[in-house]
A protein has these predicted regions:
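Divalent metal-dependent phosphate-bond-processing catalytic cores, especially two-metal-ion Mg2+/Mn2+ enzymes
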Residues: 2-5, 21-30, 34, 38-50, ...
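Short, well-structured alpha-helical segments
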Residues: 30-37, 55, 59, 97-105, ...
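An active-site-proximal "capping" alpha-helix that borders the catalytic cofactor pocket
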Residues: 36, 77-90
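RNase III-family endoribonuclease catalytic core
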Residues: 72, 91, 97, 105-108, ...
Length: 227
């Protein structure tokens, strides 16, 4: 795809994201998608990706990845249809469209919970997935965790509600089970550092993970009245 057409496709994707993700709480809003895009392009540079066509796949997949997030949508099939139609309208080749859709549909934490892994993920897949996971940890991750919990009226912490072990995909996705915001660190966020796939992602995750460990330790100290 020519450079001008690629730039136009990205602008249209940004507009689609703003439109489709409007009204969501700040944990999964358009700003999240834009941060993931920026992280993905930065990781791609560190991983040596320089082909404009490959970078376009990374950028569009990162921008569009949360339009069909199950936590906010009632019809994931329709949301994926919106994405597929958009990719065709902006002139991407069939192979590029298929790769972007594969990244979006396969990159979620819920897929690894259920062991539905892409056995040999492409570098582009790994980059976008790592970028999304980086935005889930560290200072931004802490802010997003409590923002989402607040939007669902979840308790910050309840010592009687323990983190769930060996989560199935169904339990992880359940909107019915009572959970606390602090438990999300144990059930998901603390696990992400060791699930990074690119060397660049692994390196960045170390600092963000340590920040969360310190935060949660301080949280428990303050909750118990010891600090």
């Amino acid at each position: 795809m020519a450079a001008a057409a690629a730039a136009a496709a990205v602008r249209c994707a940004e507009e689609l994201v703003e439109r489709e993700m409007s009204g969501r709480d700040a944990s999964h809003d358009a700003a999240h998608a834009l941060r993931v895009r920026d992280l993905a392009l930065s990781l791609a540079a560190e991983q040596g990706v320089s082909s404009p066509d490959r970078l376009l796949i990374v950028e569009l997949a990162a921008l569009l990845h949360d339009i069909g997030d199950y936590k906010y949508t009632k019809d994931n099939v329709e949301d994926m249809s919106i994405i597929k139609r958009f990719l065709e309208e902006v002139g991407l080749e069939e192979g590029q469209r298929e790769e972007i859709v594969a990244i979006i549909t396969g990159m979620g934490f819920k897929n690894e919970v259920s062991n539905k892994l892409n056995a040999e993920p492409t570098l582009e897949f790994a980059i976008v997935q790592d970028a999304d996971r980086l935005d889930a940890i560290g200072a931004i991750g802490v802010a997003r965790c409590f923002t989402y919990g607040g939007s669902k009226n979840s308790a910050l912490h309840d010592p009687n509600v323990l983190p769930r072990d060996n989560l199935s995909k169904e339990k992880y996705m359940s909107k019915e089970e009572k959970q606390t915001s602090i438990n999300h660190f144990h059930e998901k966020l603390f696990k992400l550092k060791d699930m990074m796939k690119t060397e660049a992602g692994k390196k960045r995750a170390e600092k963000r993970h340590k920040f969360m460990e310190n935060f949660v330790a301080e949280f428990y100290e303050e909750w118990s009245g010891r600090a």
